[in-house]
Amino acid sequence: MAMKRAMNLFPRYSVIAIAFVSALIFSSAPARGAAWNGIEPLKTRRDEVVKLLGAPIGESPDGVMRFKVMGGSVQVSFVNDRFVTAKKLRTELAGTVLEIVLQHEHSSDTPESLKLLNNHAFARDETKTSTIFRNMKEGLIYTFVEGMLRTTRYTFADDQLAKARRY
């Protein structure tokens, strides 16, 4: 009888143990912004971006680099000293990627094809001609113009910025 009772409790305790271990693993994962092609906000430096994407086709006076990629172009902006001061970040973050903006020339992606319409992780904003889906927890923003994907922004996650602050 005691053996039968122990065997009945085993599945219950194993489910609880698995849930506990899973929660522990997922809660200890580091905060990360949305990465693209190995480039990650607040981690990747300018020289690493050039190594990954090649020579830029242009660079603005404030340091935003433009690259031609398959399917469009990409702009990579970097953390500068003003941003570090304004957001009270650690000084070593100056020179890391702030944001990656991928401009799609002929994308056929729609909110439906990316399964964004019922995804509650994304906040939705609409204007007459555009729809924007934002997931700031992951640092990902999609902009659709007349229903077609035009830009994808990869930036830092909310809690990644909080962890980057100096205290």
For each predicted feature, which ranges?
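N-terminal secretory signal peptides that target proteins for export/translocation
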Residues: 1-11
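Short, contiguous, well-ordered secondary-structure segments
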Residues: 7, 24, 84-86
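Short N-terminal leader segment in a subset of presequences, especially plant chloroplast
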Residues: 12-17, 43-44
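Bacterial N-terminal signal peptides
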Residues: 15-25
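Sec/Tat signal peptide C-region and signal peptidase I cleavage site
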Residues: 29-33
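Short, recurring structural edge motifs at helix starts
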Residues: 34-39
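A cross-family detector of function-defining hotspots
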Residues: 44-167
